[in-house]
Amino acid sequence: FFSVAMQVAAHEAKLGHGKLAEELRDMIDAAKRQGSTTGTASNLVPINKPRGELSGLLTVTYPKSRLCDMILEDAVSEKLKRTIKEQHLHSKLQEHGLSPRRKLLLVGPPGTGKTMTASVLAGELGIPLFLVRLDSLITKFMGETAAKLRQVFDAVGNVRGIYFFDEFDAIGSQRGLANDVGEIRRVLNSFLQMIEQDQSNSVIIAATNHPEILDYALFRRFDDVIEYGLPDQTQIAAMLKGRLAGFKSTRSAWK
């Protein structure tokens, strides 16, 4: 664009329109200076960045992680590969009346890779990762939490992405427990209805360290329940090898 504009300015100068040519050059120089200060990637606003009230409910990231970055049990790895493959083929599956798995419940001890799994799926599928902020979702006012949850599910239908509910037992605990709270029960009822009615192309992931206290109705709403276990000695060694691959060492003993 700038080169074409400079050619126009030179042409006008040849025709004797010196003032016009000078004004064009000044405009080009000003545009170049403005572009150098505002055209950096750090100032670009992601097109899927939540706005308005959603900005307090969802945190968006664009992970680059891949499945090969994780050390997993074979059963877990196969389930994730199947999910990724089905998501890549979701249009073809829908043509045949089938639906890909897109509602996943991840259970297991802390530090076993549940949160990283959400990042890996987002990276493999090339879609944004939306973390649902439970601290903003849950409020003390009756009915407000369910209304905010509705906003989250509206976003699920409008923008394709990975929507991740971490520490899901905060809103998914069994109804009827001794410490049951009426407002959380209503939130759970709303969640059960919304996730069952959801027909979007987004992937919904919930993760918890305490599957034993989840409400039984939740397990029927998810397409797949993936159980993570603590790594064995072989997996720990493989993880350390991957992390230390860029370092030179002749004294590492992996056994």
Task: Describe the role of every protein-language-model region.
Residues 1-85:
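AAA+ P-loop ATPase mechanoenzymes
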Residues 13-17, 246, 255:
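AAA+ ATPase "lid" subdomain C-terminal helix
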Residues 19, 23, 163, 251-253:
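Alpha-helix N-cap and coil->helix boundary residues
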Residues 61-65, 173, 249-255:
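Short conserved motifs of the RecA-like P-loop NTPase core
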Residues 75-79, 85-251:
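Walker A/P-loop NTP-binding motif of AAA+ ATPase domains
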